Amino acid sequence: MTPELNLKSLGAKTPYIFEYNSDLLEAFPNPNPNLDPLITLECKEFTSLCPITSQPDFGVIFIRYIPKDKMVESKSLKLYLFSYRNHGSFHESCINTILLDLVQLLEPKYLEVYGDFASRGGIAIKPFVNYAIKEYQEFKEKRLLNAK
């Protein structure tokens, strides 16, 4: 029997929101909290707006995390990332906010966010940020040194 998960997005009609909204994120209980899988999530169609010119910025967002007690529900993550569509923010700020929102939701052992943004004006911006609980600080430092 499947436990009651109380998820709002999965299996429901999907209203797409294009203004940043962290309340769209949902989590479910980690079915194997005794394991340490490194989970990779990739959003190939991330879009936000330049806060100065209001021109669209396009990128690929990579999220990697080691869950503790909760895991992110993928449809809610998709809707959350889509909510950046009309949000004016620099690439680095988007990446930092995504990390902070996911850390608040999941309280993971480790989490990193990497953005590979399309170049504009000949410059490609590729911000990386990561977080770890005390027991994973060494892993965090190694990942930071080896970031793409």
From Swiss-Prot:
Keyword Cytoplasm: yes
Chain positions recorded as substrate binding sites: 72-74, 91-92
A GO BP annotation: queuosine biosynthetic process
EC number(s) per entry: 1.7.1.13
Keywords tagged on the record: Cytoplasm, NADP, Oxidoreductase, Queuosine biosynthesis
Active site per UniProt: 50 (thioimide intermediate), 57 (proton donor)
Record field: catalytic activity: 7-aminomethyl-7-carbaguanine + 2 NADP(+) = 7-cyano-7-deazaguanine + 2 NADPH + 3 H(+)
Enzyme class, first EC level, given as a word: oxidoreductase
A GO CC term attached to the entry: cytoplasm
MF terms in GO: preQ1 synthase activity
Compartments (UniProt record): Cytoplasm
Protein's UniProt keywords contain Oxidoreductase: yes
Pathway linked to the protein: tRNA modification; tRNA-queuosine biosynthesis
Family that this chain belongs to: Belongs to the GTP cyclohydrolase I family. QueF type 1 subfamily.
NCBIfam families in UniProt: QueF-II
Record's function text: Catalyzes the NADPH-dependent reduction of 7-cyano-7-deazaguanine (preQ0) to 7-aminomethyl-7-deazaguanine (preQ1).
Protein name in the entry: NADPH-dependent 7-cyano-7-deazaguanine reductase
Organism annotation: Helicobacter pylori (strain G27)
